[in-house]
Amino acid sequence: QELRALPSRHEFDCDYRSGHLWTSVLPRRVGLLTEWQHEASHKWGHDGLRFIPREQLSEWVASERYQAGLFDPEGGHLNPLKLALGLAAAIEGAGGRIHEQSKALGYREEGGRYVVTTEHGRIRADVLVLACNAYLDRLDPKLSSCVLPVGTYQVATAPLSEEQATALLPSNVC
């Protein structure tokens, strides 16, 4: 919810689109989608997942390969570069400073503030954001043991016209 609110609160666009669609190519895996739906509802109270049978998938994705789908209206996709640039502009607009290309070697709390040691000096801050992906090993070994790396997969094509994109993904889900 916060990710959806940030762009409008700070007046930037990151091409956020609601909705995520899991699909199954293999008939034997269709049952997993219904298991996920059941688990999400009963374990986490997430009742919004919707099972999409093969007959209805053409409304979502222009492919005959998929056997079934599971739609999550709470998921979504965005342009990560636009998000990063928008957040950076919001931070700087609020008086914050961003220290790029400053490898953090360590940090500590001191007098209610943070002191970050870099290769070229120290940075003092009231707020510290560890935006290090899953690679915190040397910076914060304790926190690193709590982080699970997540794979991200992206595909790039030649730019598609609006008409081509809509033909491939009529639902505009990822």
Describe the residue ranges of each PLM region.
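Flavin-dependent oxidoreductases
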Residues: 106-174
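Rossmann-like flavin
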Residues: 1-90
